[in-house]
Amino acid sequence: YWWEKDGEDLVLNSIKQVCAEQNIDNDRIYLTGFSSGAHGVWYISIRNPDIFAAIAPIAGECVISQQIGNLLHVPVFIIHGDQDGVIPIAAARDARGKLEKLNYEFKYLEIPGQRHTYPTKKSNEILNWFESKKRESRPHTIHFSGDLSHERYIYWIKCTEIVECFDYLDSPPPKKSQESLSNDIDNFHVNECHRIDIKVKENKIIVKSQNIKNMLLFLYDKLI
């Protein structure tokens, strides 16, 4: 499942394998999914924002919306039917409201009369929107909160030593409600132990961090 480490690793390792074996533009990797797959789109992209050029969650819910700020450089295309009886439209509207408040880039499509089914007629619109987006691989502003439990890169930063803490979901959603998390959102407790905020301004790099002991910054000419 997407909320388990093995599920997240499966997605990330699949991306790495395809990029290694095929002629893939790393700045044009996109993630989309429907229903529980859309929950996974939110979850995986928020935890790994530096990988994706854009995402399109369809009829899903952002189960770690307290970390939605990680999508600073990841445009979002939210699609949801207003008659969805499995994942209520309130989930999409809530995510839209949070992105609006942050002034992040997003597109919102609420389909009148659409129930909990995949909107096949919107496939070309999604693909065309993806085609217009390219990954921001070297941003001047970085915000990340969440899992840094292993040595990893966040854009042009590499975290090498951290204060250990648990960041995976404490308990999975009940099997009876894997599609609809609206009534079970309290089962999710995400630890925001690690946090990084970096801003490049007037030839200065301002770094604020929480529970990160050491990090490496890989600078480049256009950064400073």
Where do the protein language model's features map onto the residues?
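Short beta-strand/loop motif that positions the catalytic acidic residue
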Residues: L72, F77-H80, D84
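Catalytic nucleophile loop
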Residues: G37-V41
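Alpha/beta-hydrolase-fold serine-hydrolase catalytic core, especially in secreted/extracellular enzymes
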Residues: K101-K107, P112-I224
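Short alpha-helix in the alpha/beta-hydrolase fold that links the catalytic acid
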Residues: P88-K98, F218-D221
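A conserved short beta-strand
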Residues: D50-E61
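Short beta-strand immediately N-terminal to the catalytic nucleophile in serine-hydrolase-like folds
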Residues: L31-G33, I58, I79
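Acidic catalytic loop of the alpha/beta-hydrolase fold
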Residues: Q83-P88, H116
